[in-house]
Amino acid sequence: MNMPEERKRREGAPLLEVDGLSVDFAVDNFWVPAAKKLTYDVRPGEALAIVGESGSGKSVSSMALLGLLPKNARVTGSARLDGREILSLKGDDLRRIRGREIAVIFQEPMTALNPVFTVGFQIIETLRMHFGMTPSAAKARALELLDMVDLPDPLKAFNSYPHQLSGGQRQRAMIAQSI
């Protein structure tokens, strides 16, 4: 079955199903809970805001979905992306979905963008890795994405290093890279 048929078959079903997601960290031979039994669905076209106090597990639970937690983390529960369990994915299987099917936009993009590469290079790298684009096609798409997120001068942003952009512009660049 090809992708459009698969999506059509699942129409109306949640795109992301998180059920009983918990994250604990091993600290001094004890398990310290960071997020407890989160359950939610996200359907195509929906937006979900996860809100809470600082330290309540918002970032940790999102990073668990992407397999971005340190080795001392323990993740339990279930997370299905388009019907496929993702918490157990490792290596190449995880890299294939990360950035292509699911992404996270960090609150402080200065820590997520590599300071030694231009914004354009980083977006092109993502496009080429996940979509097999040629360098010229990836550059054209990167500029289109930067325009989509309303950066005032997409070409200037493309050629800029992260420190040359404002915080809001870096955030938009991260959104462009995640689209």
What is each PLM-predicted segment?
Residues 1-179:
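ABC transporter nucleotide-binding domains
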